[in-house]
Regions:
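Catalytic cores of RNA-modifying enzymes
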Residues: 1-170, 174-208
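Accessory RNA 3′-end/elbow-binding domains used by RNA modification enzymes
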Residues: 1-13, 19-36, 40, 44, ...
Length: 297
């Protein structure tokens, strides 16, 4: 099959790392030019946006990095990883329940500081924290700013387990949030399950399972079934700017266009035929290319 250029939202299966998913797709799609935005822990499932071909250069230019998760917290247990896959560090009887949990969830909303966990890809002095953690080492870390936009109670799937929905900013560790919630309740806590339902502009409704995608790639249907979204999808929050052939030529050659009548700001640009060109900015009536995603020819 011809390698597509675009973004493929996947419902990541449990037990796979984000890198595992890319490795599997490289063989199926016949390209090594793949990337993703927003790593998911192996135990987690849900939205993983895979960037293919020319779209890989758009991964680090995402405008919306906010995420939404459904997380199940198990009270009475604390592990070294912050989830049930880790080694047990502490157990304790649980004397609180749904009522207490509902009462205190709102205190976690808003801007706050969060200490990244040892089992994370955060780098200190050039080394990922998880490598030190696997050696039994603890590295001094600095709390980072995060925002919890919304947090709500959903259900209790098992005794001492509670599922919540969290809408948060990039860099929020739900494993740490689970432990913080437990501490506020006066009991140890860990993450029992995690599902990402939204990542930026991508949601579960756009996602397909890995087996579905592999089958479509093998049959050739992936080229025509619309599962691979256009590159500009990731820039949907920006206003669209349609330019004439003269301005298009300037953009393709990296030349600014003066006296351009558009409000200052950042735009996704299209030619007169509706072909996506790339990103451009307008400042003081001057239109400049920021990043091209189309062919120059």
């Amino acid at each position: 099959m011809q390698t597509p250029n675009g973004i493929l939202p996947i419902d990541k299966p449990a037990g796979w790392t984000s890198f595992d998913v890319l490795a599997k797709l490289r063989g199926a799609l016949g390209t090594r030019k793949l990337g993703h935005s927003g790593t998911l822990d192996p135990m987690a499932t849900g939205v993983l946006a895979v960037f293919i071909g020319k779209a890989t250069s758009a991964a680090d230019r995402q405008l919306d990095h906010d995420k939404t998760y459904e997380a199940t917290i198990r009270l009475g247990l604390r592990t070294d990883t912050g989830d049930v896959t880790g080694t047990t560090l502490e157990t304790a009887p649980v004397t609180v329940g749904e009522r207490e949990l509902r009462t205190m969830l709102s205190r976690f909303m808003g801007d706050r500081m969060q200490l990244p966990p040892m089992y994370s890809a955060v780098k200190i002095n050039g080394q990922p924290l998880y490598k030190a953690a696997r050696k039994g080492q603890t590295v001094e870390r600095t709390p980072r700013p995060i925002t919890i936009y919304n947090i709500e109670y959903l259900s209790s799937p098992a005794p001492d387990e509670y599922t919540i929905r969290v809408a948060c900013s990039k860099g929020t560790y739900i494993r740490v949030l689970a432990e913080e919630i437990g501490a506020a309740l006066g009991v140890p806590a860990t993450l029992a399950a995690l599902r990402r339902t939204q990542a930026g502009v991508f949601n579960l409704k756009q996602c397909h399972t890995l087996p579905e995608i592999l089958a479509a790639a093998e049959s050739g249907e992936l080229e025509t079934n619309g599962w691979v979204l256009p590159i500009e999808t990731v820039f949907a929050p920006l206003l669209a700017l349609h330019v004439n052939e003269g301005v298009k030529a300037h953009l393709l050659n990296g030349c600014p266009t003066s006296h351009y009548k558009a409000a200052d700001g950042r735009y996704r640009t299209y030619d007169e035929n509706g072909t996506f060109l790339g990103l451009a900015t307008v400042e003081g009536g001057v239109l400049k290319v920021e990043k091209l995603f189309c062919e120059r020819g």
